């Protein structure tokens, strides 16, 4: 289960960011973008995250995963398509082998939501624009 190792790396990245923040705010949600071609199982990643964040600065935070589909581009016929394993990922129009992946390999932190209510008194949230 490589999701366990990925979760460890994710937690370390989040810890490095969190320690650099004024007042070390409470993290409510971590939003990830995970491509279908990464072979990461979202349910396993969510389980590993919940287990590994117990007793840490991330305890109680939620992992939100947005999957991106595998999209390829065929240079000979100039079309984007969704590769299928049954076709050996070849272009359904002309049969050319998959050359360029345009989407589906992503594995990144999209953004982090902070729970301002739980923040320490040293943390000041950004000013909100006045509504007329």
UniProtKB/Swiss-Prot annotation:
Keywords associated with the record: Metal-binding, Nickel, Zinc
GO terms of molecular function: nickel cation binding; zinc ion binding
Entry-linked InterPro entries: HypA/HybF
Origin superkingdom: Bacteria
TM segment ranges: none
GO process annotations (BP): protein maturation; protein modification process
Binding-site residues for Ni(2+), renumbered to this chain: 2
Pfam families registered for this protein in UniProt: HypA
Keyword Translocase on entry: no
Keyword Calcium listed: no
Binding site for Zn(2+): 74, 77, 91, 94
Role of this protein: Involved in the maturation of [NiFe] hydrogenases. Required for nickel insertion into the metal center of the hydrogenase.
Family statement drawn from the similarity comment of this UniProt entry: Belongs to the HypA/HybF family.
Name assigned to this protein: Hydrogenase maturation factor HypA
Organism expressing this protein natively: Synechococcus sp. (strain JA-2-3B'a(2-13))
Gene: hypA
């Amino acid at each position: 289960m490589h999701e366990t190792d990925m979760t460890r790396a994710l937690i370390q990245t989040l810890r490095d960011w969190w320690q650099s923040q004024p007042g070390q705010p409470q993290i409510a949600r971590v939003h990830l973008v995970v491509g279908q071609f990464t072979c990461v199982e979202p349910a396993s990643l969510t389980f590993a995250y919940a287990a590994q964040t117990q007793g840490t600065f991330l305890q109680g935070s939620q992992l939100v995963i947005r999957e991106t589909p595998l999209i390829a581009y065929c240079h000979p016929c100039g079309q984007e398509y969704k590769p299928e394993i049954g076709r050996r990922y070849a272009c359904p129009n002309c049969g050319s082998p998959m050359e360029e992946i345009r989407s589906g390999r992503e594995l990144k932190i999209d953004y982090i939501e902070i729970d301002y209510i739980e923040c320490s008194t040293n943390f000041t949230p950004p000013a909100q624009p006045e509504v007329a």
